[in-house]
């Protein structure tokens, strides 16, 4: 049975300046990983009314109390009864959770009402996060050499055409490079249907490669590929031919097959 205290003190290093005086909601969301709506109950204390975003490892729920500490002497106080959305980043975790406030956005009566999918403010935060995610994905698409929808036919050891340009260094963080042979079902950028592409990825489970996409035979998806500049040997062998090798090392480079329509839409958007 999980035991939790009724009061979770969280220190906010607060700018105590409303959103309009700082930056756009999208900019606030981009810099934040803990976002919640709350009501000031007394000087320096906020009751959490709704949690919009937080890391899975952070325990923060409706009804928890948050201690708000101003970052600068003379900052405007948060008055009792004030409702706001707080955009913050986690800092210190222990008996007290300490977060830095990026900014806060006062919630007026028009935003406190319940919308069809939750509070109106929740919808605004979710919309801003979607804009952030789309902007990040579009940037990855624009810099990719190839964008394809396809299926991994096989995984094999790397077939280098020559010795890597950089001597191999043997460390505990050896990437253990592997190659995925991907059959292109649909080429969205830089490829045509029916092609086969060599994609290199670190097979190592070392902490240095946590979050780096891994491939498996039979895997289907939408892949954003870049010419291999990581292994020191950018060319590979396939069916007796020398071909360009690619990588997909960012979490946004490997998406589901169902994400292909959204990728197409972003590619058409100016």
Regions found by a protein language model. Name each.
Residues 18-270:
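Transition segments tied to proteolytic processing and entry into folded domains
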Residues 1-5:
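Positively charged n-region of N-terminal signal peptides that target proteins for export
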Residues 7-18:
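Bacterial N-terminal signal peptides
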């Amino acid at each position: 049975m999980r035991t939790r205290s009724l009061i979770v003190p969280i220190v906010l290093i607060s700018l105590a300046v409303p959103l309009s005086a700082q930056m756009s909601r999208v900019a606030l969301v981009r810099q934040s990983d803990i976002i919640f709506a709350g009501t000031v109950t007394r000087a320096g204390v906020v009751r959490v009314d709704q949690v919009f975003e937080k890391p899975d490892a952070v325990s923060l729920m409706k009804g928890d109390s948050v201690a708000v500490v101003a970052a600068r002497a003379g900052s405007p106080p948060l008055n009792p009864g004030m409702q706001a959305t707080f955009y913050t980043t986690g800092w210190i975790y222990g008996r007290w959770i300490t977060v830095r406030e990026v900014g806060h956005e006062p919630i007026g009566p028009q935003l406190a009402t319940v919308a069809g999918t939750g509070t109106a403010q929740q919808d605004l935060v979710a919309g801003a996060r979607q804009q952030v995610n789309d902007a990040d994905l579009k940037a990855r698409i624009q810099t990719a050499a190839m964008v394809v929808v396809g299926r991994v036919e096989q995984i094999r050891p790397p077939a280098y055409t020559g010795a890597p340009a950089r001597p191999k260094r043997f460390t505990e963080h050896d990437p253990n490079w592997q190659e995925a042979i991907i059959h292109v079902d649909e080429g969205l950028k830089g490829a045509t249907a029916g092609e086969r592409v060599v994609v290199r990825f670190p097979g190592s489970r070392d902490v240095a490669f946590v979050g780096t996409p891994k491939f498996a035979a039979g895997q289907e998806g939408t892949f954003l590929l870049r010419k291999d500049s990581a292994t020191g040997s950018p060319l590979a062998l396939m069916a007796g031919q020398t071909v360009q090798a690619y990588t997909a090392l960012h979490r946004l480079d490997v998406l589901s097959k169902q994400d292909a329509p959204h990728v197409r839409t972003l590619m058409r958007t100016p």
